[in-house]
Amino acid sequence: MYSIEFSQLAEKQLYKLEKGIQLRVLNVLERIRLRPFHFIKKKRGTPYFILRIGEHRVILDIHPEKFIIFVTELGHRKNIYD
């Protein structure tokens, strides 16, 4: 099972979201810990992956050799790709 770690930026972005959305993001991250590659999509031109949660996106850096899912950034889809 993978462990989940957050960057400082991702932590700040998470706490800026509404409480209901925060809980939804954390619940989905907890569910993907077992098989993360089943739920994500590769972000073009980068080594990162995208997890879609409604209208929000979570940018992930996955290290399969260490079993770590590193959350680099998250937010609403209209702002996350800038």
Where does each model-flagged region fall?
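Enriched for short, Lys/Arg-rich terminal
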Residues: 1-5, 9-12, 16, 20-23, ...
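A short, surface-exposed loop/turn module that caps and links secondary-structure elements
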Residues: 28-51
